Amino acid sequence: MRRASRRAMRSYMRYFYEAFALTGTSEEQILARVRADLSPRLRTDLQRDSIVLALGHMGNWDLVGAWACRRLSTVLTVAERLEPADLFDQFVAFRERLGMRIIGQGRGEKVFDRLVAAARDGGPYVIPLLADRDLSASGVDVDLCGHTARFAAGPAALAERLDLPLYTGTMHYERLSVERRRAAGSPWGLVLTLREV
C-alpha cells in the first residue's frame, strides 16, 4: 500500500510540476512529450467536423490539450469554476495561452447549451470532456470492472445532439529514451490513446 501511495503521490506532483512549467515549454518540447496512438478514423472525422472525447482523470490533459491544439485542432472544453475567482481566471488564461478555448462552469450551472453554441461557432474542435465523475443528477450507470459506476452523460449527449463522432481518451506516462528525452526536456512523456466509440 505504501509503495502504491508513493507512486500515486509522485505522479500527482509530476502533474503539478508539468502544468505549472508548461507555459515556459517550447513547442518542440510539447510535441516530443506526447506520443499519440490515434484511431485511423480520427483525422478523417476532424476534416469533416468536430469530435467529442470522453476522458478520465489521468495523466496531464493540459499538456495533451496543448499538443492537440498543435497536431489535431483547437481544443474546446469546460472548466469547473474554482474559488477564489482569481485562481479560476488564472487557470483559464493559462489554458488559453496554450491555444484552448475554455467555457467556465460554476456549481449547479447548466453549461450544455453554451457548449453546443460554442461548438457550432467555428471549429472543427477537439472537445474533451471528463466522463469518469458525474457532478449532476443526470449521470448514467455503467459497468466498470464488474462494478456499477456513475459516469457523466455529457460527452455522449453532446456527440448525439451535434451528430459528432464520440471517442474515448486515455493516457499513461512513459519514460523517454535518450534522444526523445533531450527533445522533450523531461524524462517523462505521455502516451495518448484515442478510439472511436
PLM feature spans:
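Soluble catalytic domains of membrane acyltransferases
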Residues: 23-197
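Negatively charged linear elements and acidic catalytic determinants
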Residues: 1-33
